[in-house]
Amino acid sequence: MKRAIHALDAMLAGLTLAMGQDSPALVSFLFHALFQDERERNSDLLDPQQGITVKMFRRLVEYFLGKGYAFVSPEDLLRGVASSGRYILLTFDDGYYTNVRSIPVLEEFSVPAVFFLSTDHIQYQKSFWWDAVFRELKNRGKTLEEIVHVNAGYKRLKTTDVELCLRKEFGQAALNPVSDVDRPFTAAELKDFAAHPLVSLGNHTKDHAILTNYSDSEIQEQIHGCQDAVREMTGKSPQMIAYPNGNESPEIRKVVRDCGLQFGVLTRPGKNRLPIEAGSSEAMTLKRFTLWGDREVDAQCRISRSTMSFYRFFKDVEVQTDARLSSSRHS
């Protein structure tokens, strides 16, 4: 079903772009780990998630530059961008060491990117829990569908509780990284990485906390703690947060603003209308597209430029329905 919707979107994008409907907007893309090639992507050392290789990432940058888009950083957005422009914001979540592979591409085309950091993983050199789940269950012969189902259950818990479950089920070493592919940056590596002029840093909470699972005081600790840790390790203060798993609320956004952050990004696809005023409701809920390694890069780029999308329409309906259900449960 999803593939059929994407096929329809590809046709719709071709029609709308042929009619000149490539409106001014901020278009953002979400990445996680960067794989050197397909062999590494299929190594089962970690959850491949979107399965993006360096070659695919490079092609996306090349594509949008060829279409006249300008690449921006959070600092550019804070200074303000022209409402008549078309912009790309490249974002990487979590703090995987393999994000260093983006640097040659960023340098080749002189484009910036923002990297959202889960600081406890860096400071304590822990595997991300979903990678541990993927490794352990793959080794036990579980299918991808079964692993996704297990992860959905864990996403209802706090990170510390998930990690406790994994250590109990798979042993104390379950959250130890097994290679350079699945591990986070070290603090020393991050300091060097952060010094690059094309690198901006973002807040991703202390331990990739899905914030809607936490109390008000815990939310503050997660966001403020990450902000403090990034400053301590790099001397930089993030201007932007990526809400882990995309989960946020008006109460969470207030904490984000109180912490001095000016922008927040979701995992929900869509174009962001201009202008974007720092600290506004729109600035705190910027949408991001996800690039997938099993689909043609150019086709996905065209879909993201289009003003119309069946997939985005259905996702918006799903989000609105979930919000109404959540509101009714808490009323």
List PLM regions with ranges.
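C-terminal active-site subregion of NodB/CE4 polysaccharide deacetylases
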Residues: 1-91, 97-99, 128, 134, ...
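Metal-dependent polysaccharide deacetylase catalytic core of the NodB/CE4 family, i.e.
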Residues: 29-35, 85-88, 109-247, 285-286
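Short, glycine/acidic-enriched loop or turn micro-motifs at the edges of active sites
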Residues: 96-97, 207
